[in-house]
Amino acid sequence: MHFFVRKYRGKAALLSIGTFDGYKIYNCDPFGKCFHKIQGATSIVEMLFSTSLVALVEKDDGNNRKLKLINTKKSTTICELTFPTPLLAVKLNRKRLLAVLEEQIYVYDISNMLLLHTIETTSNVFAVCALSPNSENCYLAYPDSRDHEPRTEGESSSPNVSNSAVSGQVILWDVINCKQITKIEAHKDSLACLAFNSDGTMLATASDNGRIIRVFAIPSGQRLYQFRRGSLPAQIYSIAFHPDSSLLTVTSSTQTVHIFRLKEVYSNLERQGLLPSSPPPKESLLRRSSRSLIGTVGGYLPQSVSGMLDPERDFAYAHIPGDKVTSIAAFGPDNTIVNVATYDGNLYSFRVNLRTGGECAMVNHFCVGLTAA
């Protein structure tokens, strides 16, 4: 299952789901199914923003080695690629398509599907990586290999199955020029989740421990924020930035959706009258605002100081009903809504009070059909 939300020619919110008999694409607001293809079981469905271009990985005899690039509007297959080992993830933006295998990442020019580079990685069985959605700040983040360093006290009590070959260090890679930019010391435990903001100027990280969420400036790697999800370990399922980078939402195995406020960004937007509750400004203004704050925050919080500060708790939160199940979240089209999709086929919408925070009210609940394959 893949959950995708982005402003594109207005506002859009799309949810794509791979199922045992094909795949579906839903519009979240207003809710409705906008595409359904009956075929074999589909394990990966990735959309290029709100376009008709979709990357699919079918469960072909269980090997998951074939990638198809589909135009859903024309019902045509643009290309097919077969890989030596199973595909674990596919990432794409307007410039690049990445095919993620356990020990390689293939980098393609999406305009002609020419293979540009193959990155050799450590064994990354959970495909922990992120591709910036921004075509100018076009970066890939993925884990460095673990050097078997001893863990510090309090960092080894995670109840989750660890991606043990993966370290807590992030490699930042320029996928336009095909070169490594820097390494970021993010966590002691193995990395579990990575996410860029819409501009590619911030990177959020979480480890297998799941207690701490950190945000770094990109490409410098300067630590900007540190948030505490909870006092007990948990498995982090997803991280997503608000479109203007003022908020961050996190889902985990606790069934609580945490929403953190990036205070310096939020305060700057408030001064400029660019808060999400205001009439939506031009995207370029939001981008300039969030970019300018990167330098400002970095100036106030050098890494040696920010590492000593107590992590902040969530600003707002929501509870997912029912049994514990894997979930993913993203901010909805009116920017005060957090949409949460669960792997048992439910879509929940929660409203965030941007002034007071606290518990978010559920405003919608829809069933999105079959459980994802």
Curated annotation (Swiss-Prot):
Motif (L/FRRG motif): 227-231
Gene3D superfamilies: YVTN repeat-like/Quinoprotein amine dehydrogenase
PROSITE patterns: WD_REPEATS_2, WD_REPEATS_REGION
Single GO term (MF): phosphatidylinositol-3,5-bisphosphate binding
Domain of life: Eukaryota
Subcellular location(s) per record: Preautophagosomal structure membrane; Vacuole membrane; Endosome membrane
Keywords: Autophagy, Endosome, Membrane, Protein transport, Repeat, Transport, Vacuole, WD repeat
Chain positions covered by the region annotation Disordered: 142-163
Pfam family, one: PROPPIN
GO (cellular component) term, any one: Golgi apparatus
Start-end of each WD repeat: 144-183, 186-226, 231-270
Summary of the knockout phenotype: Impairs atg8-processing.
Family the UniProt entry places it in: Belongs to the WD repeat PROPPIN family.
Domains (record comment): The N-terminus might form a beta-propeller domain involved in specific binding to phosphatidylinositol 3,5-bisphosphate (PIP2), leading to the association of the protein to the membrane.
Functional description taken from the UniProt entry: The PI(3,5)P2 regulatory complex regulates both the synthesis and turnover of phosphatidylinositol 3,5-bisphosphate (PtdIns(3,5)P2). Necessary for proper vacuole morphology. Plays an important role in osmotically-induced vacuole fragmentation. Required for cytoplasm to vacuole transport (Cvt) vesicle formation, pexophagy and starvation-induced autophagy. Involved in correct atg9 trafficking to the preautophagosomal structure. Might also be involved in premeiotic DNA replication. Required for the recruitment of the atg5-atg12/atg16 complex to the preautophagosomal structure.
Name listed for the protein in its UniProt record: Autophagy-related protein 18
Species of provenance: Schizosaccharomyces pombe (strain 972 / ATCC 24843)
